[in-house]
Amino acid sequence: MIDSLDLVIDTIVAREVLDSRGNPTVEAEVLLEAGAIGRAIVPSGASTGAHEAHELRDGDSRYMGKGVTKAVNHIEDRIAPALCGISSLDQASVDGTMQELDGSDNKSSLGANAILAVSMATARAAANGLGLPLYRYLGGPMASLLPVPLMNVINGGAHAANNLDFQEFMLVPHGASTFRESLRMGAEVFHTLKGLLSAQGLSTAVGDEGGFAPNLTNNDAAGDLLIQAIEKAGYSPGKDISLALDVASTEFYKDGCYAFGGGSYTSTEMVNELEKLVDRYPIISIEDGLAEDDWQGWALLTKKLGKRIQLIGDDIFVTSTKRLQQGIDQNVANSILIKVNQIGSLTETLQAIDLAGRSGYTSVISHRSGETEDTTIADLAVATRAGQIKTGSLSRSERVAKYNQLLRIEDELGTQALYAGATGQGPRGRS
């Protein structure tokens, strides 16, 4: 029998490690009284929303200013003394203590990267102390739904040095009957796409998230290539595999207009352009179709397309219950992207997912472009029954690590495992 005292936090250590772009990030280890340990590494984004929690960097000559020794020191000098002696099972108390210690609105004092590393490591330590997998510890007995992957196979925008304006062109294999099958379908299309690019003399080098980053004439050319790859791989576009976009429109929004593809568009014109894409391609999800503070544009987009497809708010919501509630009140979007480092604690992340679910919004658990071998988000997707996950392409080990963890979870669940695509709990379908 496990003694509750065994699950009390005894020691917390931190270190500076590297992410998938070669930039420093924070790793934390939480050791419990009985010896159980939890380790977590935080990710980092390239296209970050202005309203995200503050990622603390050193700003000195090391690593071109991107070192995180300040955040590491905050963990060992300030956070550890405050948390030692607290039960690892009380996640809300652990996270609340760190937020009070920080004292700012956006975690700029201690750094969201410091707080999140400890938050995630604490949950994993508690799970290990109880002898439970993380998804079961966080989600309880109902944690059995495997997510539909949104696979970013063509990278553009801030994620690639090419001429594509939109940031992500994704495959959505919702027609599979299991997660394992969905992964195979995506991999087969990925390799087929590589062959098509190579045959046209286009680059098959990959971007930050493992997708190809070719120079194409325009965004439509990317859509055409994906349809061709899906069909050549033996699948039916829209039935077996649909498409999803991350427009990341904040990146090209300036002075009230959207500048891309050689043109300049008002919010209304931008909505019309997106509607044309939905009419032309089997697109079932669009992320950040409008900029992070273009609330009126977002409302129009939702009115026009909200009943046809999933409209994900990333930069506009930044995993914040406050901003999500504002969106709910204004009928903006119908889905929220969940990035743990946008808000900076596991407790607040779970609160955002809960609010979304109670309000009829879907949640899409997401990686960042600067990732690591940490697989917490895979467990989080199953724990929360989110039904969707964005964790990159079918290459680069920091992306594949999450897919492999989901395969392990599916195997462990056995006959209890459900695939969100097969149960209708994945992305919203087309009407």
Swiss-Prot record:
- The secretion signal range is none
CDD domains in alphabetical order: enolase
Question: Which positions are catalytic residues?
Answer: 209 (proton donor), 339 (proton acceptor)
> Per the annotation, how and in what number is the cofactor bound?
Binds a second Mg(2+) ion via substrate during catalysis.
The residues listed in the UniProt record as binding (2R)-2-phosphoglycerate, with positions renumbered to this chain, are: 167, 339, 368-369, 390
An example Pfam family from this entry, by short name, is: Enolase_N
Q: Where in the cell is it found?
A: Cytoplasm; Secreted; Cell surface
Q: Which GO terms describe its cellular component?
A: cell surface; extracellular region; phosphopyruvate hydratase complex
UniProt keyword list: Cytoplasm, Glycolysis, Lyase, Magnesium, Metal-binding, Secreted
Q: What is this protein called?
A: Enolase
